[in-house]
Amino acid sequence: MPSALAFVLLVLNISLLKGQSPPGKPEIHKCRSPDKETFTCWWNPGTDGGLPTNYSLTYSKEGEKTTYECPDYKTSGPNSCFFSKQYTSIWKIYIITVNATNQMGSSSSDPLYVDVTYIVEPEPPRNLTLEVKQLKDKKTYLWVKWSPPTITDVKTGWFTMEYEIRLKPEEAEEWEIHFTGHQTQFKVFDLYPGQKYLVQTRCKPDHGYWSRWSQESSVEMPNDFTLKDTTVWIIVAILSAVICLIMVWAVALKGYSMMTCIFPPVPGPKIKGFDTHLLEKGKSEELLSALGCQDFPPTSDCEDLLVEFLEVDDNEDERLMPSHSKEYPGQGVKPTHLDPDSDSGHGSYDSHSLLSEKCEEPQAYPPTLHIPEITEKPENPEANIPPTVDPQSTNPNFHVDAPKSSTWPLLPGQHMPRSPYHSVADVCKLAGSPVNTLDSFLDKAEENVLKLSKALETGEEEVAEQKGAKSFPSDKQNTPWPLLQEKSPTVYVKPPDYVEIHKVNKDGVLSLFPKQRENNQTEKPGVPETSKEYAKVSGITDNNILVLVPDSRAQNTALLEESAKKAPPSFEADQSEKDLASFTATSSNRRLQLGRLDYLDPTCFMHSFH
């Protein structure tokens, strides 16, 4: 035994020294079936060990213990085994192994499980055809057609094949692949005209592998730049050139830049016929003449007017001395109508809805009346003597000759002279002064009004003599009236009784009652028996001027009657009071006739106190 073992080891050592060894492990490459009826398997042999090596393929079917050897080693080439229809079963799984054997030993590959249904790899499609066609709109395309592999039964439905094509320009490197599905034709659009294209195709069953690419087929795309396209491009070029020429011509003609033509500035507002160059040069006269204007329109200084009125001129004949007859004062006065077409506004005073804008022109202020000192004493020491007035004291300005007033239109016979007292502050000052001074002021204003009225009448001297004879009796030469008449125009005459403001109700109505004076002393007024509200407050101006409007004609008449009853019965004042009462009655009549007015002109009040 030991000698035999030693001999074997000696042989092995000799073999190793010569470079011989057992074969290497072979590897099965793939198994493919072209039509599910036959299939072929290929392997890669290992090292042979320096000795001749024999390769064999054995297989067994799933569920069987019998091992089979490859039926055909020659049909499919070296290192392959072909299974014909006789040895192929599509519903069986094959377990395939490759064995390598030489003198030094043997080796086997890893087993491969094969299902003929999933190892199908068909042959490439055949009859590949390329055609260039043209649509109705003269657009060209490439039409590719092919046929299925020959050994594949596609018509009976035994196989369902899918196809792919690829193409590229002849000089390109990358292929453009298109999947066509189950179709055996395909249209390729948008190919470059004048280029030569190479096309190939392949197929694959439902459960298998892609076949090899077919042989290359080539086609050259025609140059489809037709005459129609050339004409279109020529027209486009001509139009572009014309547009460019028009733009250049417009820029050169107008002298504007290209940017101004493309992006014109936003135009500003303009007045038709308005020359901005004249305005910039400051030539206003030329600008106005271009606009058709002679000069700048006159500016108005009536912005501070409280109310806009219709301007009405007073008739000068309405300020005449009223008649001393027993008839109602003012009945004998017949005003003279002015021209209705004059600028005074009498032409439209019958319209109660028409108002004109008033813009008063500056009026000359009436002369301020001053009361001189009376140094002579009357013969009757008990008579009322007007007190000495301080020349530095402020006396009211009586605006007795104002020719205009702004109010609603009235009838010619209803125009009234304006009262000289309009300022509440001045009235309060007069009320606080002695009674004789206040009486002198009032008498003086009333006589001035009478004198102006007398001067307007024709035959002024005759009328003055008649009125003097009626006013002053000849048997009373020792009264103060002749003395005051000779001294100055400021004659002391006891005026009619005046009224005081008793209260102002919520509606702005003043309650007035007569003020009693006896023995040159002002008595405190008592509560009147019946207070008659006859005036309303129409408004208060900026100078604290209270604007009064007569409420009714009957109330004023009643107040005049009460004042006449309470007047003292002295003979010296009878004639003067008759004259003044006649004037007051005339004024009252004028005021009563204005009962329809709703307001007075505040601007007229303001002028009398300047």
Curated annotation (Swiss-Prot):
Residues 20-229 are extracellular. One of its GO terms (molecular function) is cytokine binding. Residues 318-327 have a biased composition (Basic and acidic residues). Its main location: membrane. GO terms for biological process: cell surface receptor signaling pathway via JAK-STAT; cellular response to granulocyte macrophage colony-stimulating factor stimulus; cytokine-mediated signaling pathway; lactation; mammary gland alveolus development; mammary gland epithelial cell differentiation; mammary gland epithelium development; negative regulation of apoptotic process. This is a receptor for the anterior pituitary hormone prolactin. Keywords: Disulfide bond, Glycoprotein, Membrane, Metal-binding, Receptor, Repeat, Signal, Transmembrane, Transmembrane helix, Zinc. It is found in: Membrane. This is Prolactin receptor. The WSXWS motif appears to be necessary for proper protein folding and thereby efficient intracellular transport and cell-surface receptor binding. The box 1 motif is required for JAK interaction and/or activation. A motif (WSXWS motif) lies at residues 210-214. PANTHER family: CYTOKINE RECEPTOR, PROLACTIN RECEPTOR. Residues 317-355, 458-482, 564-584 are annotated as: Disordered. Zn(2+) binds at D206, H207. A motif (Box 1 motif) lies at residues 262-270. Residues 345-354 have a biased composition (Low complexity). It is a single-pass type I membrane protein. Belongs to the type I cytokine receptor family. Type 1 subfamily. Disulfide bonds join C31-C41, C70-C81. Residues 1-19 form the signal peptide. Residues 254-610 are cytoplasmic. Interacts with SMARCA1. Interacts with NEK3 and VAV2 and this interaction is prolactin-dependent. Glycans are attached at N54, N99, N127. GO terms for cellular component: cell surface; external side of plasma membrane; plasma membrane; receptor complex. The lineage of its organism: Eukaryota, Metazoa, Chordata, Craniata, Vertebrata. The chain crosses the membrane at residues 230-253. Residues 22-122, 124-224 form the Fibronectin type-III domain.
